[in-house]
Regions:
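Short, surface-exposed "cap/lid" segments of acyl-processing enzymes
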Residues: 19-75
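N-terminal cap/lid segment of alpha/beta-hydrolase-fold proteins
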Residues: 1-25
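Alpha/beta-hydrolase active-site loop
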Residues: 81-101
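Short beta-strand/loop motif that positions the catalytic acidic residue
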Residues: 268, 274-276, 280
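Alpha/beta-hydrolase fold nucleophile elbow
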Residues: 92, 101-114
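Conserved alpha/beta-hydrolase "acid-adjacent" motif
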Residues: 281-287
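Alpha/beta-hydrolase-fold enzymes
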Residues: 100, 104, 117-249, 253
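Catalytic active-site module of serine/aspartate enzymes centered on a nucleophile-bearing elbow/loop
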Residues: 292, 298-337
Length: 337
């Protein structure tokens, strides 16, 4: 990230060191909006090499833009986290820090993937009373994945978990040891799509597609090159947790399938706007449909669902036409309050 950002450290409620990135913008006319990244990436995932990325468009629309590096960020020390830890410790502390620094009592949020699942747990448990609008991409409370991904979680994960504590798509650039080189060889032998080796490693790690997290037609060359440096370590502990959630069809506490986070009523008055890429092969769009149906039963007509026909998972944020197809919709929903 360049000098357009200030870095503000904060401690999660359990003492883990995280940070916020604050986009430097003269005299924002609207309140703070927090962007929350997914697993195995960092806040810079919202900052692709385009002047029309979501950060700049939010700032141009008058928002005070903040980005959270929670404990799953590759900018922070590797650690074996699960969604419960993030939900109960990281997001509440980040939102509290923003309200302290800005003086605003309300925050809006744009959240993605495991930043989204963990943030939604926080909201459901009433830990984010300051957050009034949540724009969630890809998955929220009800993870639904392709059948091959179910196979990988149930059959391959137990095997991989005996050898690795982390997987790391950056092995596509440099694999540090024999076992990581073996993984890279397997990926190169089974992924023939015209993506970078890191991009192929991403698809192997997170989904069931060639590629899984974006449509290649949605990316320009500059963005494809940039992606290679935006993925790194993700712990096996996360995959074990999400496997339990997928099995139950709803987010559940780590190691416990008897309770779940489909709280009724949810302990938040936030309006929730869901985005799902129809071509997503990491979390199927059905994930967001199920969460919307749950929200609609709880408060009919209050929440919103967008299914984006041309998009997958992360190209929602760094697709070459996202500034035309996606960001105006998100900003409009934030403006509605």
């Amino acid at each position: 990230m360049n000098t357009q950002f200030d870095t503000i450290p904060f401690e999660a409620l359990d003492g883990f060191s995280c940070n916020l990135k604050h986009f430097i913008s003269p005299n924002p006319t609207k309140g703070p909006v927090l962007l929350v990244h997914g697993a195995g990436v960092r806040s810079n995932i919202f900052n692709p090499p385009s002047q029309q990325n979501i950060i700049h468009m939010l700032a141009d629309a008058g928002y005070d833009v903040w980005l959270e590096n929670w404990r799953g960020s590759i900018d922070l020390a590797p650690n074996e986290w699960d969604l419960d830890q993030v939900a109960k410790n990281d997001h509440p502390a980040a939102v509290q820090k923003i309200t302290e620094l800005t003086g605003s009592q309300e925050v809006k949020a744009i959240i993605h993937c495991q930043g989204s699942t963990s943030f939604m747990i926080s909201a459901a448990l009433g830990l984010l009373p300051q957050v009034k609008v949540i724009v969630s991409n890809a998955v929220s409370l009800h993870p639904v994945i392709p059948k091959f991904s179910v196979f990988k979680l149930n059959v391959l994960l137990p095997i991989v978990g005996t050898v690795f504590n982390y997987l790391d798509p950056s092995w596509g650039i440099e694999a540090p040891d024999t076992k990581s080189k073996v993984i890279r060889k397997v990926v190169q032998a089974t992924h023939w799509e015209k993506d970078t080796t890191v991009g192929k490693m991403v698809s192997f790690t997170y989904g069931a597609g060639w590629p899984a997290l974006w449509e290649l037609d949605n990316l320009d060359k500059k963005t494809m090159d940039w992606i290679q440096y935006e993925f790194a370590h993700v712990p096996i502990s996360f995959f074990r947790h999400i496997r339990n959630c997928v099995k139950n069809g709803v987010l559940v506490p780590s190691g416990n399938g008897e309770t779940h986070y489909e709280v009724t009523p949810m302990q938040t008055d936030a309006r929730i706007v869901l985005f799902g890429g129809v071509k997503n092969k990491c979390f199927l769009a059905e994930s967001q449909v199920r969460t919307f149906n749950y929200l609609e039963k709880e408060k009919p007509g209050f929440h919103k669902l967008y299914l984006m026909e041309k998009y997958s998972h992360l190209d929602i944020f760094f697709g070459k036409n996202a500034h035309v197809d996606v960001f105006p919709l998100m900003i409009n929903e934030l403006d509605k309050g």
